Amino acid sequence: MVEARVHTGAATTKGIIMTTLNPYLGFRGNAREAMEFYQGVFGGELTISTFGDFQASVEPDEVDLVMHAQLTGDAGVVFMGSDTPKHMDYAEGSNFSMSLSGSNDDEAQLTGYFGELSAGGTVLQPLMVAPWGDSFGMLKDPFGITWLVNIAGPGASA
């Protein structure tokens, strides 16, 4: 297992904490292979957590699938990915989302984004405390784009 660590999104510009926006790629059973490939291309640090790490799998044969992976490349490229469980829709070619993340200091802003993006769309996962301690929610906006919102839990380090 690769060290499990979740990105807090606490990027700074001149000391100001800001929300980060990253692509989030979806895969069907080969997220680890894909993210390791991208690490070979971009270098940097790759962290991976499985569904089993958080007892979050619905199917017993999915415990070793990637629940969350993050690659921070040598040149600052940051993107994330995961395996899409069998019970969720998956279509190759449209297997990406946008991820908004920030610290608990950004909670009001990120909660506002969640509400505004979901207006006229569909909340797929309400914004609530997740097994890893952060607040997390997922929605599909009125234009069909899936958004993931993650707010670092209290005491999370940047």
Describe these PLM feature segments.
Residues 2-19, 47, 67-72, 77-82, ...:
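Vicinal oxygen chelate
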Residues 16-17, 25-76:
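Core segments of cupin and vicinal oxygen chelate
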Residues 61-62, 91-94:
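Short glycine/proline-enriched turns and hinge-like loops at secondary-structure junctions
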